[in-house]
Swiss-Prot record:
Activity regulation summary: The chaperone activity is regulated by ATP-induced allosteric coupling of the nucleotide-binding (NBD) and substrate-binding (SBD) domains. ATP binding in the nucleotide-binding pocket (NBP) leads to a conformational change in the NBD, which is transferred through the interdomain linker (IDL) to the substrate-binding domain (SBD). This elicits a reduced substrate affinity and a faster substrate exchange rate. Upon hydrolysis of ATP to ADP, the protein undergoes a conformational change that increases its affinity for substrate proteins.
Family from the record: Belongs to the heat shock protein 70 family.
UniProt keyword ATP-binding present: yes
Native source species: Pongo abelii
InterPro entries assigned: ATPase_NBD (IPR043129), Chaperone_DnaK (IPR012725), Heat_shock_70_CS (IPR018181), HSP70_C_sf (IPR029048), HSP70_peptide-bd_sf (IPR029047), Hsp_70_fam (IPR013126)
Domain of life according to the entry: Eukaryota
This protein's name: Stress-70 protein, mitochondrial
């Protein structure tokens, strides 16, 4: 157990009395920089970073993801291989072990619900025992399991995957989208996270980037990124609120924009509130109504539930622009009396009634954020809406009532976050020079002290990066080591907050309690990730302490997952190569058979039979295409093409000679006719 040194505390008080408040702040480990000085240091730091190549901005969303890059001074959102500007954050594993990402995964979810993962961002950095995870287990068709480290992982076909891995598969798709556009490898990235993510969730997101093969230069908050997208070309100084209600999380941030400086004043939110909850609420309503009308309970039928889930999401989206929608699902299920169909009309008012409590849950964080930023709603010059759920009229009305002004539609709610991430990438690369971002830590950071009390060292909404040191001592005579538990949260007792990890400082010289002086430094970097170091002031010996959390991914875990991801990438490349070769082969077969039929009178029968044998061999090869390489199929197809070209060349020559013969014969007859006329 540790305690604050009484002697040191007394000296600190004395120093404060004799030297004034500034000295006291230096004495207790405060860095002593004024706000303006901090800004100058930040600018110098940005300018000194040398980043080679393009930096992509990625919004790794709960429901959809988006990628953007800077083109000159403008950010450009990129289209994926399917031609869409956003990609569903869905990953599926088929029975034969194939991995699908994005829309192909979403399309097959109805027939493969148990092995199709969606909204796994809600699990990232979370323990299996978290109440939110336990709630999620009841709502999703796939298996959420306890990993060996106690984290929540998912299972498909007997294989376990961490949420960071699933996120990495989505990031690989975004990376591929960027590379297809850029024409070269995309290595560096800025990835966004919900502002209210804790240290474990931020670290797990960085891990996802590493697994996908990306160098994550910075993790930035989603509302802050959206503010960058909004304010990049604005010259007016103002305070703005960013209301971000996405697929899985809710954030509210209050920012001040002043001469290119984007300073976050406060942030708040709920990491388990979003569009998925709206879908789930509507799904429960539909299932309840269906049971009332037919007596059939759909909760035991995963395939039927997946169809209802997709219909609920579609209805939710339609009701943003229509006052009523129809939900029609024929042959949804069956009982002894025959097939059962779902036919239901749903009005906007009904839907709003179903989700009213969810919308209300966004109000308290907004009020708290304004209170922390010390602003009233009259001080806020603009309210920016981010996230797909903000298209819902009831949400927009709630925001208007809350802030006393109609929200701005200046940014695309689906793309603003990725655009902001790309802008921050431009800042880090030195391409954007007139922007400075000052973000904050969303949660207080501290340690557990005697009696299980949570002692805060860095308060929430402190501008990051930041550092704070404090002197601790032993709680017992002769104590040679101290255990320090690092927590994050706002509750009074340490046990009620998120335990980030704990470490033990050993090798303290035996002494009476309260005598050893151990200076512990807590450091939050620009990604919002926590680092801790300690120094024994008595011996002058300094030690770097690595927080050993009982959860999270180890270095070996990440290395294995990187190899796994590379294996999948190689498999994807081979599959693509094989598909392209098969398409080429089938095209050659079709063209060859068409030409053989067209020129059958000019082709020698024995040569035709040989070519037909070649085609049969090619078809046999295509029948076992899954076990063949793309190169083998391509070579066989090229061989068939060469053989067919030789044969058709023979046919062409024969036709040409026949035409020549018939032409000369016709000329002779014409001359005979002319002779007869003269006679």
């Amino acid at each position: 157990m540790i305690s604050a040194s009484r002697a040191v505390a007394a000296r600190l008080v004395g120093a404060a009395a004799s030297r004034g408040p500034t000295a006291a702040r230096h004495q207790d480990g405060w860095n002593g920089l004024s706000h303006e000085a901090f800004r100058i240091v930040s600018r110098r730091d940005y300018a000194s970073e040398a980043i080679k190549g393009a930096v992509v901005g990625i919004d790794l969303g709960t429901t959809n993801s988006c990628v953007a890059v800077m083109e000159g001074k403008q950010a450009k959102v990129l289209e994926n291989a399917e031609g869409a500007r956003t990609t569903p954050s869905v990953v599926a594993f088929t029975a034969d072990g194939e991995r699908l990402v994005g829309m192909p995964a979403k399309r097959q979810a109805v027939t493969n619900p148990n092995n199709t993962f969606y909204a796994t961002k809600r699990l990232i950095g979370r323990r299996y025992d978290d109440p939110e995870v336990q709630k999620d287990i009841k709502n999703v068709p796939f298996k959420i399991v306890r990993a060996s480290n106690g984290d929540a992982w998912v299972e498909a076909h007997g294989k376990l995957y961490s949420p960071s891995q699933i996120g990495a598969f989505v990031l690989m798709k975004m990376k591929e989208t960027a590379e297809n556009y850029l024409g070269h490898t995309a290595k560096n990235a800025v990835i966004t996270v919900p502002a209210y993510f804790n240290d474990s969730q931020r670290q797990a997101t960085k891990d996802a980037g590493q697994i996908s093969g990306l160098n994550v230069l910075r993790v930035i908050n989603e509302p802050t990124a959206a503010a960058l997208a909004y304010g990049l070309d604005k010259s007016e100084d103002k305070v703005i609120a960013v209301y971000d209600l996405g697929g899985g999380t809710f954030d509210i941030s209050i920012l001040e924009i002043q001469k290119g400086v984007f300073e976050v004043k406060s942030t708040n939110g709920d990491t388990f509130l979003g569009g998925e909850d709206f879908d789930q609420a509507l799904l429960r309503h539909i299932v309840k109504e269906f049971k009332r009308e037919t007596g059939v309970d759909l909760t035991k039928d995963n395939m039927a539930l997946q169809r209802v889930r997709e219909a609920a999401e579609k209805a939710k989206c339609e009701l943003s622009s229509s006052v009523q929608t129809d939900i029609n699902l024929p042959y949804l299920t069956m009982d002894s009396s025959g097939p059962k169909h779902l036919n239901m009309k749903l009005s906007r008012a009904q839907f709003e009634g179903i989700v009213t409590d969810l919308i209300r849950r966004t109000i308290a964080p907004c009020q708290k954020a304004m209170q922390d930023a010390e602003v009233s709603k009259s001080d806020i010059g603009e309210v920016i809406l981010v996230g797909g759920m903000t298209r819902m009229p009831k949400v927009q009305q709630t925001v208007q009532d809350l802030f006393g002004r109609a929200p701005s539609k200046a940014v695309n709610p689906d793309e603003a976050v990725a655009i902001g991430a790309a802008i921050q990438g431009g800042v880090l690369a030195g391409d954007v020079t007139d922007v400075l971002l000052l973000d904050v830590t969303p949660l207080s950071l501290g340690i557990e002290t005697l009696g299980g009390v949570f002692t805060k060292l860095i308060n929430r909404n402190t501008t990051i990066p930041t550092k704070k040191s404090q002197v601790f001592s032993t709680a017992a005579d002769g104590q040679t080591q101290v255990e320090i538990k690092v927590c994050q949260g706002e509750r009074e007792m340490a046990g009620d907050n998120k335990l980030l990890g704990q470490f033990t400082l050993i090798g303290i010289p035996p002494a009476p309690r309260g005598v050893p002086q151990i200076e512990v430094t807590f450091d939050i970097d620009a990604n919002g990730i926590v680092h801790v170091s300690a120094k024994d002031k008595g011996t002058g010996r300094e030690q770097q302490i690595v927080i050993q959390s009982s959860g999270g991914l180890s270095k070996d875990d990440i290395e294995n997952m990187v190899k796994n991801a590379e294996k999948y990438a190689e498999e994807d490349r081979r599959k693509k190569e094989r598909v392209e070769a098969v398409n080429m082969a089938e095209g050659i077969i079709h063209d060859t058979e068409t030409k053989m039929e067209e020129f059958k009178d000019q082709l020698p029968a024995d040569e035709c039979n040989k070519l037909k044998e070649e085609i049969s061999k090619m078809r046999e090869l295509l029948a076992r295409k899954d076990s063949e390489t793309g190169e083998n199929i391509r070579q066989a197809a090229s061989s068939l093409q060469q053989a067919s070209l030789k044969l058709f060349e023979m046919a062409y020559k024969k036709m040409a000679s026949e035409r020549e013969g018939s032409g000369s014969s016709g000329t002779g007859e014409q001359k005979e006719d002319q002779k007869e006329e003269k006679q």
